[in-house]
Every structure is written in structure tokens, then in C-alpha cells.
Amino acid sequence: MAAAFLPSILVPLVGLIFPAFSMALFFLYSQKDDIA
């Protein structure tokens, strides 16, 4: 059963890495933004 350990990988990935990546991407986007 390969799907047994899949939630233990997907939950930290979606819960920790994706928010951190989106926060960093939004931070870099707001830093290079020169509309204001």
C-alpha cells in the first residue's frame, strides 16, 4: 500500500511549505512593486 504514507507527506507539504512559499513569493512581489 503506497497510499498509506501519502497523507503524512502531503499534510506538512501543504500545511507548512506551501504557505511559506506563497508568503515569500508575495514578499518578493511586494518588494519589486513600484506602483505605490
From Swiss-Prot:
It is a single-pass membrane protein. Disulfide bonds: none annotated. Its main location: plastid. Keywords: Chloroplast, Membrane, Photosynthesis, Photosystem I, Plastid, Thylakoid, Transmembrane, Transmembrane helix. Pfam families: PSI_8 (PF00796). It is found in: Plastid, Chloroplast thylakoid membrane. The chain crosses the membrane at residues 10-30. GO terms for cellular component: chloroplast thylakoid membrane; photosystem I. One of its GO terms (biological process) is photosynthesis. May help in the organization of the PsaL subunit. Belongs to the PsaI family. PANTHER family: PHOTOSYSTEM I REACTION CENTER SUBUNIT VIII, PTHR35775. This is Photosystem I reaction center subunit VIII.
